[in-house]
């Protein structure tokens, strides 16, 4: 489904204290690069028993250089973010065929504290961002 992925995780284990929306029991994940080092995509893979979850993700700045979501104080507090530099942002990608038709969920970015590896999926209300933004403009 997602293709071959390297075995070495990019980051140590990530912890989602509340799971992901729709998947409350999926709390432990690793981020694994999809393809070679030049690939802009990774797989967010669940480590929890009974959850066979994988999401293709990417760094939004690679495709959306002007993307600057405002993470609300609740999410920032739960993740103990002291500054914007503490946060790693990822967006979930829906891979299409052809790949040029793939989309990214800019409305629900994954926010990771770079220091503690605490993570959450933020939901950006009234932001103007969409759940299916084209990766490649048409």
Regions found by a protein language model. Name each.
Residues 1-66, 84-138:
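Long, compositionally biased stretches
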Residues 73-83:
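Short active-site loop/helix that positions an aromatic residue
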């Amino acid at each position: 489904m997602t293709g071959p992925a390297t075995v070495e995780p990019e980051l140590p284990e990530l912890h989602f204290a509340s799971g992901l929306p729709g998947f409350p029991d999926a709390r432990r994940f690793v981020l694994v690069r999809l393809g070679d080092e030049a690939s802009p995509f990774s797989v967010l893979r669940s480590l929890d028993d009974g959850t066979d979850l994988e999401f293709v993700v990417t760094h939004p700045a690679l495709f959306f250089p002007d993307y600057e979501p405002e993470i609300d104080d609740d999410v920032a507090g739960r993740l103990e973010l002291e500054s914007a530099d503490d946060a790693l942002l990822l967006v979930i990608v829906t891979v299409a065929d052809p790949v040029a038709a793939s989309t990214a969920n800019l409305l629900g970015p994954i926010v990771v504290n770079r220091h503690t590896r605490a993570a959450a999926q933020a939901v950006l209300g009234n932001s103007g961002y969409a759940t299916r933004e084209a990766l490649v403009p048409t």
